[in-house]
Every structure is written in C-alpha cells, then in structure tokens.
C-alpha cells in the first residue's frame, strides 16, 4: 500500500485507467480506520498471492486532502473508494472483515477483465 499525497495523486488516478484502483481513506486518530487498514492489508496480500496479481492500493489521510472527500462524496471514514477510469464506482464504509473486503475487491477486479 502506498501513501497518497497531492504530488502522487495524479499518478494514482492514471493507474485506474487500466484496472480498478483502490483508495483507502482514513484519519490518524480513528481506531476503526486502523482496524480497517489491517483487514485491507490481509485482503490485499491474499489477492496478490492467491490470484498472482499486483493490485495497487493507496492510503490517504483525508485531513491532508479534504478535497478528495468533496470530489468523491466521502461522508465518513474509514472508506474504501474504488476508482475505475478516474471515476468513483463504489464506496465501502462498513469494512466488516478481511473476507468481505477481499470479496469486494475481487468483484471489482473481475468486472474489468
């Protein structure tokens, strides 16, 4: 997972032109965000290992880039934002489990195949 900054944001958007790009939005003091991030790490590792993929996930502190919340209609954190061709196609707020995140990511990736 890669930390997203204003400088790296445009490069990350370009990644979504070829396949879905996953952006995890959080704040540093959010306990639920920390748990969600760990579940996302497990799901990502499983996808990249079992499916032989190199799925990219960005992480963004929404306090440092509030314009993303406005642009993509983010109402709370944690949020897993799924971008395809630069457009938000899904927002996931209830990160219930690593398995749930895994299924959400796999479904998004399969739509692009």
Spans of model-derived segments:
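Short active-site neighborhood of thiol/selenol oxidoreductases, capturing the structured segment around
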Residues: 16-28
